[in-house]
Design a protein with these regions (language model features):
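N-terminal capping/linker segments that flank leucine-rich repeat
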Residues: 2-116, 183-186
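Intrinsically disordered, low-complexity segments
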Residues: 28, 149, 153-156
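Residue-level detector of functional hotspots within protein domains
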Residues: 69, 119, 145
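A sequence-composition feature that detects small, non-aromatic residues
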Residues: 70-71, 99, 121, 133, ...
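Structural signature of tandem-repeat unit edges
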Residues: 81-89, 103-116, 128-144, 154-170, ...
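Register-specific detector for alpha-helical tandem repeat solenoids, activating on a conserved position
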Residues: 95-96, 121-122, 147-148, 173-174
Length: 186
């Protein structure tokens, strides 16, 4: 019997891509692990259903608005392999946001507004299948904590950190711990 895990995101304009299908989810729909429920404000709330009868999407693209709860750790299901987020909201912490997603291979945060983010600690920790993280164009001028941000990302091949202003960064302990294949471009 499946269990429901509530994910505390309000999302607008979300698209779920499947291996062979692309769905644009309507206000009330249930398909492949994902139930979107309309809240009357034009925003949806995301629920992950662990029912084994329905396969999980392998890619999520979020455009326009995503509003996480204050602690946004462990928010994505383990079977997703690609995440792309375009964000324009005032969020100060991404602590453990993508940590322990063992199947994720690609994350694109290039359109993410991170100008107010202060904490990126453990953000991708234990994403041991992660090969590519597009962090180009993100603003980390307010970030003070990146401890273990990529720790144990053993498949990560390269990161482009050129043009990143790390003047406020005070904690970067073990940021690339056990990233045995990583090449950094600075």
């Amino acid at each position: 019997m499946g269990t429901n895990k509530k994910i505390f995101f309000k999302i607008k304009n979300i698209k779920f891509e499947y291996i062979t299908l692309l769905f644009l989810l309507l206000p009330i729909i249930s398909c492949n692990f994902i139930n979107m429920k309309f809240k009357g404000t034009g925003e949806e709330q995301l629920f992950i259903n662990s029912n084994k009868e329905r396969p999980c999407p392998n890619k999520i693209t979020v455009d326009d608005v995503i509003i996480p709860n204050p602690s946004c750790k462990y928010k994505f299901p383990n079977k997703i392999v690609t995440i792309k987020i375009n964000l324009n909201k005032d969020i100060k912490s991404f602590h453990k946001m993508f940590s322990d997603i063992s199947n994720i291979i690609e994350i694109d945060l290039s359109q993410l507004d991170t100008s107010l983010v202060e904490n990126m600690a453990n953000m991708f920790e234990n994403c041991n299948s992660l090969i590519f993280a597009n962090l180009s164009n993100i603003d980390i001028t307010s970030v003070t904590n990146m401890e273990k941000m990529f720790s144990n990302c053993i498949s990560l091949k390269s990161l482009d950190l050129t043009n990143m202003d790390i003047a406020k960064l005070t904690n970067h302990k073990m940021i690339f711990n056990n990233c045995i294949h990583l090449k950094i471009h600075i």
